[in-house]
Amino acid sequence: WRAARALHAADLRHPPDGGRRRRYGDWRVEVVGAVVDRPRDEVYRFWREVSNLPLFLDHVGAAHEIDGVVRGAVDGPGERPVAVIARLVSDRPGEEIAWASTEASEVETRGKVRFRDAPGGRGTEVEAIVAYIPPPGRLGAWIRRRFRRDPDLRGGRGLRRLKRLMEREAARP
């Protein structure tokens, strides 16, 4: 937990080792970002509505929030959904959303999404920092394989999808 707390508190805009380091003890860490040509509050509100997550993160199934606890599922081995249950630990409108998994979650995870005005009035910088500890056994092996090659986190495909979705919606008459 010490590494996770330090990770959560750290400003990982420029992670150690120039961003090459992807492990902190048992924790695996991904940092991705994108610029969305929409106002910061609009991008924040869209992300904050957890039912929107499956629209741009294709490995996330239906998600809902009750009293600051988000329950959802991610694709698991053999089409089996894996429960992710996380408590919101920070919700600063227009700035940051942060979470940490509960003991009931099948995957130990924590992370944050930051929203900043992009330079030159170009919209919003979105930065997602996700840390997780793969569980032991078959599920853990599957998660390690998936996240090692998963373009949703590694290549920022989910954020690119968010960008396209929000910018297209804004362009519609």
Per-region residue spans from a language model:
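Hydrophobic ligand-binding cavity/cleft-lining segments
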Residues: 2-69, 77, 161, 165-172
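Intrinsic-disorder/low-complexity, polar/charged segments enriched in Ser/Thr/Lys/Arg/Asp/Glu/Gln
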Residues: 27-33, 69, 83, 96, ...
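Short strand-connecting beta-turns/loops that link adjacent beta-strands
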Residues: 39, 93, 118-122
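Short beta-strand segments that buttress and anchor functional surface loops
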Residues: 71-77, 97-104
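Short, cysteine-centered beta-strand-loop-beta hairpins and adjacent loop/turn segments enriched
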Residues: 76-82, 134-139
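Beta-strand/loop substructures that line and gate deep hydrophobic ligand-binding cavities in soluble
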Residues: 100-157, 164
